[in-house]
Amino acid sequence: MENNEIEKGHVFSLADIVNYVPNSVISHTILRKATGTVNVVSVDSGKELIERTSPFDTFILLIEGKAEVMIETKSFPLDAGQAIIIPAHTRNSIVGIVRSKIMSTIIKSGYEEVIM
């Protein structure tokens, strides 16, 4: 995973931040702070971001392509330009139906804790 932040004060294209790599998921960090992160991810067709559960809400924007977001057992197909908020404490994954680029934004407000 690439962790070099994007230079501040400069215009950039989200779609140009990461390239597609066959059979891979590639991530690049735009911004990383103690209060949250913004990443752009490229997902090859049929590849899946690792299933996980986050203690924070996650905003997902599909930049290009077509992807399926799974939240618990419910499927949400996304087309380019569409977005979804994955609620905190839910099992989720993202699969590229075709090659896709995704922006993921996590904002940590400080009140979240793992609920058991």
Describe every region a protein language model picked out.
Residues T73-P87:
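Short acidic-glycine-tyrosine-enriched beta hairpin
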Residues M1-T35:
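A short, N-terminal "cap"/entry segment at the start of jelly-roll beta-barrel domains
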Residues F56-A67, E72:
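Glycine- and acidic-residue-biased ligand/ion/polar-headgroup-sensing regions
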Residues S24, N39-S54:
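Conserved short histidine dyad/triad with adjacent acidic residue
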Residues L49-E51, V69-M70, I86, R91-I97:
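Short beta-strand His + acidic residue motifs that chelate non-heme Fe in jelly-roll/DSBH
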Residues A88-E112:
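Ligand-binding loop in jelly-roll beta-barrel domains
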Residues I63-E64, D79-A80, V98:
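A cytosolic small-molecule/anion-sensing beta-strand core signal
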Residues T37, K66-E68, S75, R91, ...:
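Structural motif
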